[in-house]
Every structure is written in C-alpha cells, then in structure tokens.
Amino acid sequence: MSFIHLHVHSYYSFHDGAASPAGLIEKAKHFGMPVLALTDHNRLTGAIRFYDLAEKSGIKPIIGAEIDMEGDYHLTLLCKDMAGYSSLCRLLTAMHCSKCSDRPMATRDMLDRHHEGLIALSGCRLGEIPTLLSRGDMD
C-alpha cells in the first residue's frame, strides 16, 4: 500500500507552504504516490490547476481545505465527490462573507449547513481534538 498525503499546503497557504501545485505533483510522481490532496488554508485558489495537473500526471487528486473554526481551531476537510466540492465552495464563501471575525472563520452552524460530501480529518496540532488532548481534557 502506498503512502498518501491528505494534508498538503501550496504557496497559496501564506506562511505555511512554499511549493507550487505543479511542484507538489512533480514530487508526488517522483515518489510514486498514486494520490495527493491539496488542503490550503481557507481557500481553493490552486485547486483547479492542481486537479488538472494531477490528472495529466496520472495522480488521483483530492481537493480540500484546512479551515479556521470558531474557538481558534483548524479543521481539514476533503471533498469526497462533486457534492463535497460544492459544499466546500459554499462553506468558504460563507466564511469569507461572515463578519464573525477579522479573518475567515467557520462556525459549527455553517459546517452543519455545508457538510454534504465532505470528509473531516482530526486536523493538525491546532485541531480541536489535539488541542483539547494537549490540555488534558479527555472529555
């Protein structure tokens, strides 16, 4: 079984990623990875280019995003299908149009409304689960 990266940032995740979508595809191909996800912060800026380049390179692309959630947590979302892509687009639009914060942020209500076709990962070290566990909160 091959290793698959499900949480990858490109240079569209400012201060968090340095590679272009094309560079990510090139490295994945070099290492024989059959699948690769792109999960930039709060945006899908490189998603279409990434998808097209991955398919042309014989790599199965997974589109997603790492979003900022209320409570100052991160949540990584992957699109399972076109319904997931549509849900993620609607969620990101709602986040960017919301006046909840000085930066795009999702509320649980937004996620409840726009979740069809999405897969949620437990997240990076700034995810809700890792943060609560690091505080000793096991409930």
Regions found by a protein language model. Give the residues of each.
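Phosphodiester-processing cores and adjacent nucleic acid-binding clamps
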Residues: 1-139
